[in-house]
Amino acid sequence: MNDVFLKALPVLQKLTTAGFEAYFVGGSVRDYLLCRTISDVDIATSAFPEEVKEIFPSTYDTGIAHGTVTVRENKECYEVTTFRTEGTYEDFRRPSEVTFIRSLKEDLQRRDFTMNAIAMDEHFELHDPFFGQLAIQNKEIKAVGKASERFQEDALRMMRAVRFLSQLDFHLDKETENALQKNIALLQHTSVERITVEWVKLMKGPAVKRAINVLLKVEMETYLPGLKGEKSALIPFASWEWDKRTTENVIWLGLAVAVKKANVTSFLKAWKLPNKTIQLVNQAYQYALNGKEYWQKEELYYAGKEVFSLVNEINVIRGQENKQNELDQLYETLPIHSKKDLAITGGDLLEWADKSAGPWIKDTLDKVESAVLSQAINNDKKHIKRWLGYHEE
């Protein structure tokens, strides 16, 4: 049995000893059945939140309104959630009310897909009222109950379906795919931040091409930031050589290059990306758009290692030769890698010139930077001083 489950087992045992039901649920059970890496576990119980808090001496009210209490056990924290049913969904995301219950089956019934609606007890026996194991054997993503109802409860589940398709290399069952197509417009009610997280996970899966093809088939791109009308650009984009090691920066640079937006910054901001990511992708965009493979030393210097490495990575994904080693070697031959590496500072210039600070300092440092970079002069303080025409003291 997986060590993650064994370490968390005392939590289940304490709950059952107190007279309650308790199970491992959700993604951890699914991934166990798929022999995938498990990083953490979720625990569901018939104990109500206050009852959970009575059993464990160290708890935190992390989501108590929805029945979740974080329990500290053996120096680890575990989320323990009470079985619950949910009222109507008012915004295609959040239930209007949550009711705590004692029935495992009713709790599993509210979950998104059958493969995620399997529970495992303290004896590691599986409880699978919706045939999630069969779906896993058939490599099938199948909604629990009526697919349209599940998607209308939380529209993000449609994005999750396609993400799971990519991650697990599964396929959608017919009813789930039909419901996806029928309800796809509801995705516009989902926050961009949640969509962005799912997109990145999708792009790191082994079945990216199939996932994006399904996404395009149901016209999901219409409701993704900046991708409406970009079907013809996304078809070849899906065929690039993506893999799970792909970084987020490469994903966003690749998408920007594929759709060729006039304003890259606005496109990336629409996905609510961090400013650092937007800035880096912007710096690399023009190089990547042209598929730049061959660089002069000065180009490597002004682009910087992070940018030229990013451009090379997207080139490789598009089928070009990997030139990272030779680019790194050429970069290492540069006399300096940034202006900070210059042997002089603005303070030196002020001392030598004996005049007030002004724009002339930046202009002079730029001139020195260019001269050192072209190796017209050595990056040596005395040498630079003489070259600038200041006499030695």
Swiss-Prot record:
Keyword ATP-binding recorded: yes
Pfam families xrefs: PolyA_pol, PolyA_pol_RNAbd, tRNA_NucTran2_2
Cofactor needs: Mg(2+)
Enzyme Commission number(s) of this protein: 2.7.7.72
Record keywords, A-Z: ATP-binding, Magnesium, Metal-binding, Nucleotide-binding, Nucleotidyltransferase, RNA repair, RNA-binding, Transferase, tRNA processing
The UniProt record lists the keyword Magnesium: yes
NCBIfam families recorded: PRK13299.1
Subunit structure: Homodimer.
Entry-linked SUPFAM superfamilies: Nucleotidyltransferase, Poly A polymerase C-terminal region-like
Protein name: CCA-adding enzyme
GO terms of biological process kind: RNA repair; tRNA 3'-terminal CCA addition
Catalytic activity: a tRNA precursor + 2 CTP + ATP = a tRNA with a 3' CCA end + 3 diphosphate; a tRNA with a 3' CCA end + 2 CTP + ATP = a tRNA with a 3' CCACCA end + 3 diphosphate
Binding annotation for Mg(2+): D40, D42
Function: Catalyzes the addition and repair of the essential 3'-terminal CCA sequence in tRNAs without using a nucleic acid template. Adds these three nucleotides in the order of C, C, and A to the tRNA nucleotide-73, using CTP and ATP as substrates and producing inorganic pyrophosphate. tRNA 3'-terminal CCA addition is required both for tRNA processing and repair. Also involved in tRNA surveillance by mediating tandem CCA addition to generate a CCACCA at the 3' terminus of unstable tRNAs. While stable tRNAs receive only 3'-terminal CCA, unstable tRNAs are marked with CCACCA and rapidly degraded.
GO molecular function: ATP binding; CCA tRNA nucleotidyltransferase activity; magnesium ion binding; tRNA binding
Binding sites annotated in the UniProt record for ATP: G27, R30, R111, D154, R157, R160, R163
Sites where the protein binds CTP: G27, R30, R111, D154, R157, R160, R163
PANTHER family: CCA TRNA NUCLEOTIDYLTRANSFERASE 1, MITOCHONDRIAL
Family per record: Belongs to the tRNA nucleotidyltransferase/poly(A) polymerase family. Bacterial CCA-adding enzyme type 3 subfamily.
InterPro entries to which the protein is assigned, alphabetical: Bact_CCA-adding_enz_type3_sf (IPR050264), CCA-adding_enz_C (IPR032810), CCA-adding_enz_firmicutes (IPR023068), NT_sf (IPR043519), PolA_pol_head_dom (IPR002646), PolyA_RNA-bd (IPR032828)
Note: A single active site specifically recognizes both ATP and CTP and is responsible for their addition.
